[in-house]
Amino acid sequence: MRGIFLIRSRLSIFRAPAVKCLRFSNVLPSLSNNCIVRLYMEPPVACVLPLGLCSMFSTSIADSEQVGFTRSNIEKDDESDIDLGCSISDELVSEDVGKISKLVKDCGSDRKELRNKLEECDVKPSNELVVEILSRVRNDWETAFTFFVWAGKQQGYVRSVREYHSMISILGKMRKFDTAWTLIDEMRKFSPSLVNSQTLLIMIRKYCAVHDVGKAINTFHAYKRFKLEMGIDDFQSLLSALCRYKNVSDAGHLIFCNKDKYPFDAKSFNIVLNGWCNVIGSPREAERVWMEMGNVGVKHDVVSYSSMISCYSKGGSLNKVLKLFDRMKKECIEPDRKVYNAVVHALAKASFVSEARNLMKTMEEEKGIEPNVVTYNSLIKPLCKARKTEEAKQVFDEMLEKGLFPTIRTYHAFMRILRTGEEVFELLAKMRKMGCEPTVETYIMLIRKLCRWRDFDNVLLLWDEMKEKTVGPDLSSYIVMIHGLFLNGKIEEAYGYYKEMKDKGMRPNENVEDMIQSWFSGKQYAEQRITDSKGEVNKGAIVKKSEREKNFLQQPEVRKVVREHGYSFWDE
């Protein structure tokens, strides 16, 4: 009761008049000229793979910015490497995109047939066309690379940085790092100015995604080889990539190792702090970094508070959220929209919905910060999780009245309370009517849900719809599909999707690989045992028959007698 009383007493500040506070200004320290500490050797940049041979694909043995790292942000970051902003205004280009897309679909996984049909088609590639096709086939690296190489050989077409970056990102995502470095080397030979910091940042992100921290740092050192400057922004991009893919501890280590070259800076610490808060979700480690900032003389700013409040909000520590919120005001740091959104989420999660609504009014009327879609999502999501469907719908209607359009996250919250396959497809139809197309993540969520319900007919419908209306299933989609089918006894079907995934060059995680291989080994062993046992039975029957024939003259005739109803009969 005392805890609730303290929380409610703190909530009263939301109705109090606003206190005039000075905004905290963050001054970056001057850069030092000392060299960065070298922890690893530089990577080999130039590779000798013949790029012109489409059939030769190499495999690697290694497997001012806002910091908010959620799954959706990671996906957006991946997609930003692949140019998706290509609006096809030219009717001829749009027609050519349709032709190439049909070719790709008809050829399936037959790369040789695809190469032959591309050579026979009358399509002339352009920069716009290549970017669009690479975007559509980005989950099938062999198809993408086959098309990319074919386009590069056509007269009148010269690759730009956009196409190179898209292809490098696709290769890096599928761990074809050697081939990606070959493309970078080709860019350098064609024109040294083509290789920029964004090119190497794509490689850094892909190495971080597979947790190869050493090669990510090596690639950062390769900036000098390409005559690129290694400024504080580039260093913070490295930290951001490391934290985005859960290499947060390594990022924190780099800050201290390179303090002479890159002095302690609030933004650098905020990247690591946010990694512990929103990627790893470890309040203990986040508090350690928070204390380290104070120990080295780096002041906490609004981003620091936003990360910590978000961390406590997700963990359900409402009391700590309100303490930090009070502390911000005492230190004259004005909360921004992100802070308010996190506090709204914490209040709604703790069932203080009316207080959350009051805070939304306060931020709009007294602070002049209008609630956005994220603010309403922060309220809708915990309501849906608590099965308060009617209240969630009221908030949804209120959001529409304010002229805000729901995002994919809004609909994902409502998907958690669906109960039948019919409701799933009804919600998908409403999404499209509102102009919000489902993403691959949407289909993954629904496929997982329908597999739990053992509604496999609708699972297959969703899978086909995903293949038709999105860029196609990615690795995560296949893993969810294989798990859902396998754990529900649809083992042969799961194995079919496993083979399809392997044919596309995707690497499953160890759990899926072990699960399928164990079943496949057991299946082969069982089939072999059945074959062997049948052979032994047939062999034994032949031996017994031959022995009877051989000893027929030496043995007396033996006939069996059966008894039935008190009478004896010869056994026929």
Curated annotation (Swiss-Prot):
Main localization, broad class: mitochondrion
Subcellular location: Mitochondrion
Keyword Repeat set for record: yes
Transit peptide segment: 1-57
Keyword terms of this UniProt record: Mitochondrion, Repeat, Transit peptide
Gene Ontology CC, one term: mitochondrion
PPR repeats: 160-194, 196-230, 231-261, 265-300, 301-335, 336-371, 372-406, 412-438, 439-473, 474-508
Keyword Iron-sulfur: no
InterPro entries tied to this protein: Pentatricopeptide_rpt, PPR-containing_protein, TPR-like_helical_dom_sf
Membership in a protein family: Belongs to the PPR family. P subfamily.
Protein name listed in UniProt: Pentatricopeptide repeat-containing protein At5g15010, mitochondrial
Taxonomic lineage from the root: Eukaryota, Viridiplantae, Streptophyta, Embryophyta, Tracheophyta
